[in-house]
């Protein structure tokens, strides 16, 4: 199979980018660029970022742990070469990362990894410095409902949601590094096989998943096993920060967050206020006076809590069932004695990452780019330069099934990205044997005629009694509501006219606009790997990534 790609013209539509800040930033709006420069677009700025990163080295302790963590993954001479490069002065890193979604989670996980690999290649070619792609495993996060499932399109149409049965998922606060898959992964795998086993390349990919996703495995371990297999040829390096051997290396960053909590919350609050004044939504809320670290008081693998200032020299544990508090001295003692009790927040994680690694660039999605707009004061206070922020590649896959269904209903892919009833109404009025008026035209004609007549007689009625002006306005409002109600019923009736068209529309929306969101944010890899081939699909995604772009493209097998 060969892929073609074409750039989409709706790159900045609300369907393509979900963050208002990211939309403005990708468009090059001056207000957005004042918070986060688009240095990734400029060769000279890229060279400066690489040179700055090259002046920093990876510590021997981190290199040892990286070697051990990656040694348990799928064999990869390319990864071994990249690990050796990280030990050499002058090597830089391009970093990306993601939560550990079931069966790799949404497609954008793959796109992030591919974007980091292609960006690293491009920076190395452009600057002559060794550049290594690193995938930061976000194992400190505790948001299970975001990662305990995977959605695939059924080959015959309709979505199939595969999920782990984790009774405490909604309330769990423990880092997912410690979460085992459990027995419910087996029926999820069985359902996946039943849905996809007829696809031409199913056995290869399903066997890979079944080897990795075992009940005794952790979410993070299974995720890493699969993703490392996909990018073994490219040498993608993996870093899991939730490692007891790395906790002492993280302690200085947490100490900084604790000691500078007041100052950091002040400068970050000022930044948030400036973003709000500029019309942007603040991605990460900063609590007044709170440090950017989480603390696990009960066990190293137990729930983690934010800290709020309580009385003098003490912190309350936000959300703790016993409303517990801890003194400043006890907190610092815990950091010295058991640093693994501390984990990073969304704003502190980048600083930890760039303290450990010679990061020249971070490749992120729209949400991450939005919170990167908040980070400059944090990095300035820490005395560290920010890396380049680079948007990941974005794709929409149009396989042969989707193209066939589009042809049957005579639609272009972008025409599917509208509400279901509106699309069905359009098809009904377009394809009806008799001429049918659209709901919008009907409403305009009915109410327009009434409003015109009402306006014509309004003067005459008011001349008889000026108090009737209120009655005229009420009548106009009543008729508008009645016409809108009639139009709504007409629209729904049109949408119900053709059951076949409705079925085709539902299939297409499942493939191209599932849950009214971009395909890459909802659908997972299993369907596409089973239909197209694991390596074939991965390789074509790599080939379609354009460095320093962030464009949205259609992939057409």
From Swiss-Prot:
Gene, per the UniProt record: bshC
Keywords in alphabetical order: Ligase
Top-level enzyme category: ligase
GO terms assigned for molecular function: ligase activity
Name of the protein: Putative cysteine ligase BshC
Source organism per UniProt: Myxococcus xanthus (strain DK1622)
Similarity-based family: Belongs to the BshC family.
EC number: 6.-.-.-
